[in-house]
């Protein structure tokens, strides 16, 4: 079913493109009307719509719920991908394993390359050492946690940094970071949540039309949506 949706959506995207006339800004990672590009590493796209998520760190129940809510209101809202469970990790847990640490948030790779990897994703909830501007208020801390979660789960779905693209404009001066993708949709997207050159930090955690279209192309359309409901 997912493969069939991808074939349909690939045709839709092609037609649409044809007719279309202190350091909180840094992240450590080891790894309009026109349709724009999203940068994806295809071999890392998860084969199942159900992706297990678990926590290797205890506590922070409220913050963990903020992360889950941010993901469910972004990637899971538009694409046929279900981040499931969200409980504590066990020794043999697969899927996305999240550690909480006061360092730059990052993933250990893209997509399913982090399947079952301890510290496959690292998120920061305290900002005592890294990203201290996120401590300025409780609202700021919540905003940072949610916005970063949306970005990092983009990596967990297989999406690379947009500024890594070789055809980025000269106005984008952020250095390439992490692993590159091997597939693009449309043209370079300033507004992607995966783009460090986005004038809004991590896109304020709000998926651009490109982010949405790329996620749907890779994973299929969320069951509650129709193609007509997606941004053009």
Predicted regions, residues:
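Zinc-dependent metalloendopeptidases
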Residues: 22-232
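Bacterial N-terminal signal peptides
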Residues: 10-18
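Bacterial N-terminal signal peptides that target proteins for export
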Residues: 1-11
């Amino acid at each position: 079913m997912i493969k069939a949706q991808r074939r349909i959506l690939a045709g839709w995207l092609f037609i649409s493109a044809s007719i279309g006339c202190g350091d909180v800004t840094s992240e450590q990672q080891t790894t309009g009307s026109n349709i724009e590009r999203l940068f994806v590493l295809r071999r890392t796209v998860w084969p199942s719509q159900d992706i297990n998520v678990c926590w290797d760190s205890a506590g922070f129940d409220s913050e963990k719920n903020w992360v889950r809510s941010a993901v469910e209101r972004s990637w899971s809202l538009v694409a046929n991908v279900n981040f499931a469970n969200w409980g504590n990790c066990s020794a043999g847990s697969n899927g996305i394993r999240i550690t909480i640490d006061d360092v730059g948030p990052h993933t250990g790779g893209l997509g399913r390359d982090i399947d079952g990897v301890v510290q496959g994703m690292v998120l920061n909830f305290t900002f005592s050492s890294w990203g201290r501007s996120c401590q300025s208020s409780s609202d700021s801390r919540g905003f940072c946690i949610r916005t970063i979660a949306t970005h990092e789960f983009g990596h967990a779905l297989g999406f690379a940094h947009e500024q890594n693209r070789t055809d980025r404009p000269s106005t984008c001066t952020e250095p390439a970071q992490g692993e590159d993708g091997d597939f693009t949709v449309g043209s370079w997207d300033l507004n992607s949540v995966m783009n460090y050159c986005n004038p809004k930090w991590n896109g304020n955690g709000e998926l651009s039309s490109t982010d949405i279209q790329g996620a749907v192309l890779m994973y299929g359309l969320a069951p509650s949506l129709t193609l007509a409901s997606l941004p053009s």
